[in-house]
Amino acid sequence: MLRALNRLAARPGGQPPTLLLLPVRGRKTRHDPPAKSKVGRVKMPPAVDPAELFVLTERYRQYRETVRALRREFTLEVRGKLHEARAGVLAERKAQEAIREHQELMAWNREENRRLQELRIARLQLEAQAQELRQAEVQAQRAQEEQAWVQLKEQEVLKLQEEAKNFITRENLEARIEEALDSPKSYNWAVTKEGQVVRN
């Protein structure tokens, strides 16, 4: 652009050319202070209706999805036509090979699925049998624990019954007092540090 302006401003007679620059309004740099009329101005964004914004956003999204799908469809169509035009018989042969390979892979997949299903059924049967055995063992152990608990409680009851025979009640209080008074036992004794019994 400067070269064109220099040609326009060339002077005859060997005088140096002068630039003809149009007076344009320049932009302020980021370091320049704001204008006096803009010092107290607060920039307020325009009001946006939330419902309208939601509708516009949804419509833009649908539009982009539609355009993307159309672009993908057209791209696939153009690529398919170019492939057919360039390859021809080779493309058809490759397509047949791909179909045959797909059929072989599907047959192998079905066979593998059948084999894995048989293994899965056998594993589930073994797990069910093991679970039944564990449940039977748990039930047997629980029955043994209950039986042991019942026996323990029976022994405790028998022990309490035996101890109850020696309990002092209102009925045998007088007899026990007489028996204690008539008893020749003496509890007036002590044990030394050496283990000797000292009686008075």
From Swiss-Prot:
Protein name, entry field: Small ribosomal subunit protein mS26
Subunit structure: Component of the mitochondrial ribosome small subunit (28S) which comprises a 12S rRNA and about 30 distinct proteins.
Claim: Transit peptide is one of the keywords in the record: yes
PANTHER family listed in its UniProt record: 28S RIBOSOMAL PROTEIN S26, MITOCHONDRIAL, SMALL RIBOSOMAL SUBUNIT PROTEIN MS26
A Pfam family assignment: MRP-S26
Keyword terms: Acetylation, Mitochondrion, Ribonucleoprotein, Ribosomal protein, Transit peptide
InterPro entries listed in its UniProt record: Ribosomal_mS26
Domain of life: Eukaryota
Transit peptide range per the UniProt entry: 1-27
Residues bearing PTM N6-acetyllysine: K159
Main location: mitochondrion
GO cellular component, one term: mitochondrial small ribosomal subunit
Family: Belongs to the mitochondrion-specific ribosomal protein mS26 family.
